[in-house]
Amino acid sequence: MGTLGRAIYTVGNWIRGTGQALDRVGSLLQGSHRIEEHLSRHRTLMNVFDKSPLVDKDVFVAPSASVIGDVQIGKGSSIWYGCVLRGDVNNISVGSGTNIQDNTLVHVAKTNISGKVLPTLIGDNVTVGHSAVIHGCTVEDDAFVGMGATLLDGVVVEKHAMVAAGSLVKQNTRIPSGEVWGGNPAKFMRKLTDEEIVYISQSAKNYINLAQIHASENSKSFEQIEVERALRKKYARKDEDYDSMLGITRETPPELILPDNVLPGGKPVAKVPSTQYF
């Protein structure tokens, strides 16, 4: 942006702020009788001067996430709750089908000790776990960055490579394809199995489907939410505790007064094996 562009941008900010200033003055004149309403000015997509995010229409960006400045995000990717992608001093590129999970920070480097100008480049079908930090580095297609991992300037995570959860990857480290690195500082741990490589790709696909569900829920209007709540209430199963709170007494037909393990008709209920979730 040239000098004239910056001047126009600054004047535009002044004009936009005039209404806010008048509102504040009016509130002060009302004294102790004034009513103040503090509104959140959070914006999911925010420009920095003339640099604005370029986001595909099929991308899910959670309402509490922030995508700022020179950021490009490809089709089918998802930016989850609390994430910040800050392309203010350099650019960020996120490929297609990539998921950047909750509370992750992605930033860039304009200057550092080595003097390199480093954008952040994240490829296709990448999974970035919760609360990771990715700064001025490259993550290639089908890679996996574990929860809480930190990748510093100049790091390259090659295709089908994995960074273990909680790891700190030092500057200018290259993690070769098919390897797992972990620790602080991160070092080679072992080779990925074929099953783990398939899992990484499947993880990205799972998040594409999950993002569609969240996008649908977040796009609902207030009226839709109220209608759905009324329907749930209308068709909710009324148990004895619910009825007793309302003072309702229902008669149960004699043919339905059966032990819990017996169905109508005298057939026993098949025993369902328990499932343990990790």
Swiss-Prot record:
Effect of deleting the gene: Reduced levels of complex I and supercomplex I + III(2) in mitochondrion. Reduced growth rates and respiration of suspension cell culture.
- Give the family from UniProt: Belongs to the gamma-class carbonic anhydrase family.
Q: How does it assemble?
A: Homotrimer. Component of the mitochondrial oxidoreductase respiratory chain complex I; element of the extra matrix-exposed domain, which is attached to the membrane arm of this complex. Interacts with GAMMACAL1 and GAMMACAL2.
Residue range of the transit peptide in the UniProt record, numbered on this chain: 1-43
- Give the residues annotated as coiled coil: none
Cellular component aspect of the GO annotation: mitochondrial membrane; mitochondrion; nucleus; respiratory chain complex I
Assigned keywords, A-Z: Lyase, Membrane, Metal-binding, Mitochondrion, Transit peptide, Zinc
A GO molecular-function annotation: identical protein binding
Organism annotation:
Arabidopsis thaliana
Q: Where, by residue number, does substrate bind?
A: R86, G87, D88, Q101, D102, N209
Q: Which SUPFAM superfamilies match?
A: Trimeric LpxA-like enzymes
Pfam families from the xrefs?
Hexapep
List the GO biological process terms: anther dehiscence; photorespiration; protein homotrimerization; regulation of reactive oxygen species metabolic process
Q: Which residues bind Zn(2+)?
A: H107, H130, H135
Q: Report the PANTHER family cross-referenced here.
A: DYNACTIN SUBUNIT P25, GAMMA CARBONIC ANHYDRASE 2, MITOCHONDRIAL
Listed name of the protein: Gamma carbonic anhydrase 2, mitochondrial
Q: Which compartments does it reside in?
A: Mitochondrion membrane
Does Mitochondrion show up as a keyword for this record?
A: yes
Functional description taken from the UniProt entry: Enzyme involved in the catabolism of H(2)CO(3) but that does not mediates the reversible hydration of carbon dioxide. Mediates complex I assembly in mitochondria and respiration. Binds HCO(3)-. Required for male fertility during anther development and dehiscence to regulate the secondary thickenings of the endothecial cell wall, probably by modulating H(2)O(2)-dependent lignin polymerization.
Family matches, as InterPro entries:
Hexapep, LbH_gamma_CA-like, Transf_Hexapept/Carb_Anhydrase, Trimer_LpxA-like_sf
Q: Tissue expression, per UniProt?
A: Constitutively expressed in roots and leaves, with higher levels in flowers, particularly in tapetal tissue of anthers, inflorescence (IM) and floral meristems (FM).
- Give the E.C. number(s): 4.2.1.-
Classify the main location.
Answer: mitochondrion
Q: Does the record bear Transmembrane helix in its keywords?
A: no
Cofactor(s) this protein cannot do without? Zn(2+)
